[in-house]
Design a protein with these regions (language model features):
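N-terminal, active-site-proximal structural segment of metallo-dependent hydrolase catalytic domains
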Residues: 1-132
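Metal-dependent phosphoester-hydrolase catalytic domains
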Residues: 2-53, 59-65, 175, 225-231, ...
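Active-site beta-strand/loop signature of hydrolases that rely on acidic residues for catalysis
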Residues: 34, 88-94, 105-129, 185-188, ...
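Structured beta-strand-rich core segments of catalytic domains in phosphoester-bond hydrolases
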Residues: 70-82, 94-96, 101, 116-193, ...
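Acidic/histidine-rich helix-loop elements
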Residues: 91-101, 194-210
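Soluble or luminal CAZymes and related metallo-dependent hydrolases
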Residues: 100-101, 166, 208-219
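Glycine-rich, phosphate-binding/catalytic loops in enzymes
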Residues: 106-108, 133-136, 202, 249-252
Length: 307
């Protein structure tokens, strides 16, 4: 059975990483590192392992199994049916507008025909950027928090800001009317996990950032758990599609839109081949989820259609 130590070692490592990420997740520093390491990393050795087993003429099946498991974990095999939806929600980390202009960003946002737009890192660096951007988005009302902005062309029934503990970021909670029914939209941007020198055994940064993220995620979960009726949670959640935090969002809100109606890996942070921008919905069904291939930020926008 174990005709190739290399092939089986690779396959067992990939399976072990997936199992530990799901079962233990962020409960320990080592497994948190596994959760937040881009899934594409575990796919990188696959070509070499396959070539080695083909050359040795042994262990090819095991190497292929490990490759398929790694490709599945990276989202490369993901493919869901898609149809048009009546409600369009866009989330986009705009990186303070440093890689774009009001004209370019405004044109992009208009082209999506989104009913609701959730922006993160919307504390624009250039003076007057936000005013010029809004001038290019007629018909949208704006709700601002520190570093987050929600725009909508739907009637706004209520709006509030919620502070994270020990942080300057704010969660925006906007209630709009859609088809005569109240719909709550939560725009969130929890902080990222800070690795520091954790791979070398220095946990001085990662432990506090794990605690900070846990507190921030609890804030978001408290918000969505207190709301009733249809709800969309979206934003740069700095959370890969595995691990404890990801499962908490699904349990509290509902399915991940990309899982339901996306195709391909959905990498919204292409520099690290990572999917960390999400939308989760309750009382709505995602019919199409698309990561837009644009270069106006280090993130890519996620556009989801719902019915």
């Amino acid at each position: 059975m174990f005709r190739s130590v290399t092939a089986w070692t690779y396959t067992l490592i990939v399976a072990g990483v997936w199992a530990l990420s799901e079962a233990v997740g962020e409960r320990s520093v080592p497994t948190a590192l596994l959760v937040y390491t881009p899934a594409a990393v575990w796919l990188a050795p696959a070509p070499l392992v396959l070539l080695w087993t083909l050359w040795r003429r042994r262990g090819v099946a095991a190497a292929l199994a490990g490759t398929l498991l790694a490709a599945w974990g990276a989202g490369l095999l993901h493919w869901r049916p898609q149809t048009a939806g009546a409600l369009r929600v866009l989330t986009f980390n705009v990186k303070e507008g440093r890689d774009t202009t009001p004209a370019r960003l405004g044109a992009l946002l208009r082209s999506t025909d989104a009913d609701v737009i959730l922006l993160q890192e919307a504390n624009f660096a250039a003076p007057g950027f936000d005013a010029e951007l809004l001038r290019r988005l007629p018909g949208y009302s704006v709700q601002r928090g520190y570093e987050t902005t929600t725009l909508t062309r739907l009637p706004v029934e209520s709006f509030r800001r919620v502070n994270y503990p020990s942080d300057w970021r704010q969660v925006l909670v906007t209630r709009v009317a859609w088809r005569g029914v109240p719909l709550t939209v939560v725009n969130a941007h929890p902080g990222r996990l800070k690795f520091g020198d954790a791979p070398r055994g220095d946990f001085s940064l990662i432990r506090p950032s794990l605690a900070m993220r846990a507190a921030q995620i609890k804030t978001v979960l408290d918000i969505v758990n207190a709301e009733r009726g249809p709800l969309v949670l979206g934003g740069d959640l700095n959370t890969p599609p595995r691990g404890l935090a990801y499962r908490q969002f699904i349990r509290a809100v509902g399915p991940d839109a990309h899982d339901t109606a996306g195709r391909g890996p959905g990498w919204s942070f292409p520099q690290l081949s990572a999917r960390i921008d999400h939308q989760f919905a309750r009382g709505l069904t995602a019919t199409r989820a698309t990561v837009l291939a644009v270069d106006q930020s280090d993130h890519r926008p996620l556009l989801v259609e719902y019915r």
